[in-house]
Amino acid sequence: MYALVDCNSFFCSVEKVFHPGLEGKPVVVLSSNDGCIVALTPEAKAIGLHRGDPIFKVRDIVEGYRVAVFSTNMYLYAAMSKRVTNILRTSIQHVENYSIDESFCDLDGYEAHFDLVEMMREVAAKIKLWTDIPVSVGIAPSKTLAKMGSKFAKKYKGYQGVCMIDTDEKRRKALLLFDLSDVWGIGRQTLEKLNYYGIHTPLDFADKSESWVKSHLTKPGVQTWLELNGKPCIDTSEVMRKKTICTSRSFGEMVGNLDSLKSAVANFASSCANKLRGDDSGAKKVTVFLSSNRFREDLEQYGNAASQSLVTPTSDTMEITQAALRVLAKIYREGIQYKKAGVIVSDIEPLHPFQPDLFDPIQNRPERAKLMQALDAINHRYGLKTLRLAVEGEEKQAWKVKCEHRSPNYLTDINGLMVVGDSF
């Protein structure tokens, strides 16, 4: 059996931990650049707000109902996510952090000694007590069914936070009630194909013969079908393995000069390299893209992208940044006011075991790897970007995103530590 532990309205829940006076009140978290709503509490949904709403279009509702508005703070959310995962590991041996707000738990063997529902309720209560983050839990023989169970646990209070799908009767009832478009692994194209063949519920899909599924769908579709029938076959570590990593931003202000673009692209490249090291992976291709503001018809429009291949997979910040800046120089055009840029690293491979290349222009890779370790250690201890490349520039720059409502980094920055007696 598997359990899927899903943090409820995670971004908003984290903000409420540090602003307890917001309990029971509408709260929303905005996307980068404070553009649109990416997370909201049930109270915010009740007054007519929706995920994806541009904030300027719902300003009257936000102000009229005194909605608490926060800018996204991924450093704070990631730190709290790590705490939730660590708490899970105090009770369950095999825990896989699938996303920032979801973790899979392998419960194999626990059913012989515990009532799984009561056990997971105790785990959920511990998470709530230690972090104040509410969670919903789904338990089932496959990960897809466990994700489905967590949705039911979140939607229906009668489950008291934990929904277990452990019999064929429960499985079929869940498949009948669940929305096919919400099934993990069923994207838009697959949904359209299934609908074309008269399949409108997960139960319709699960009841199809194996031969039909194999003849009409690709391997992921077959895996989803097996999972819906209670047969676990999805290796989430494979699903999670990134094929590309992208860091991009819409600028807070339009940028025209090359130096500012270099600073932005260097920051994005550095972020990609940091993510690669976190996955113990390296990339062999670096892509940079630029675009003007398509909503400003009075300005000249331009967009372009180009790539550079590397000799060997790397996660070295300096190497990736240098490659990105070379690409930027090729696609930059003077006289354009740029609104967005980004860096993509691809052709990602595990860094270990490392295979040296005879023609590698960097001959001191072991020493460079130690330098990157030192860079990461300093930034982990003293705060992100404490140590950075000179080309990345100062912390405050015009191109950086708007984040007028961002909370301090209470858990990762000594300057953001909350003082006892602070008013909320």
Spans of features found by a protein language model:
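Short, hydrophobic beta-strand segments
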Residues: S103-G109, A305-V311, Q355-D360
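Gly/Gly-Pro- and Ser/Thr-rich, intrinsically disordered tail segments characteristic of DNA damage-repair
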Residues: M1-L226, T236, R365-F424
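A general secondary-structure junction signal
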Residues: I139-K143, L290-S292, G342-D347, V391-G393
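C-terminal hydrophobic structural anchor segments
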Residues: E319, L325-R381
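Short Gly/Ser/Thr- and Asp/Glu-enriched loop/turn motifs at secondary-structure junctions
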Residues: Y98-E102, A140-K143, S281-K285, I336-K340
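Short, charged/polar surface micro-motifs in flexible loops or helix N-caps
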Residues: F10, N33-C36, N293-R296, I348-H352
